[in-house]
Swiss-Prot record:
GO biological process, one term: transcription antitermination
Name listed for the protein in its UniProt record: Transcription antitermination protein NusB
MF annotations from Gene Ontology: RNA binding
Cited HAMAP family: NusB (MF_00073)
Length: 138
């Protein structure tokens, strides 16, 4: 399984957790054993899910802050899952370049979101990296 597919699976798990309002990582273990998932990708999935769950309030606050005039309950569930994934990578997984996280989030948005989702996701993530000065650290 490639990193791209692992990222897609992680987004789906975050989506499911949100829909079920159940952010217990042990309950999603079954996803990690579907098909052939390499150990490296399992580690990535575990890391992202753990960071997303442990930092859910902080990540959601950032999403609300940068999605001007949009409350979380008005953001489409799939858009929220994509943003939670991207922010988990950008903020807590410094070994992944933020540009990769943004590009991959936009690709997921094109596949799973509405016509507006790619621009919405790009706008929020772009504003965040600009405001946080991440572009200066390249």
């Amino acid at each position: 399984m490639s990193r791209k597919l692992a990222r897609e699976l992680t987004m789906k798990v975050l989506f499911e957790m949100h829909i079920n309002n159940d952010f217990n990582i042990q309950r999603v273990e079954h996803h990690l054993f579907e098909g052939s998932i390499e150990e490296q990708q399992k580690e990535y999935i575990h890391k992202v899910l753990n960071e997303a769950i442990l930092n859910l309030e902080a990540i959601d606050s950032i999403i609300e802050e940068y999605s001007t005039s949009w409350k979380l309950n008005r953001i489409a569930n799939v858009d929220l899952a994509i943003l939670r994934l991207a922010f988990s990578e950008i903020i807590y997984m410094k070994d992944i370049p933020y540009r990769v996280s943004i590009n991959e989030a936009i690709e997921l948005a094109k596949i799973y979101g509405s016509d507006e989702t790619p621009n919405f996701v790009n706008g929020i993530l772009g504003k965040y990296v600009e405001q946080e000065g991440l572009m200066l650290n390249e």
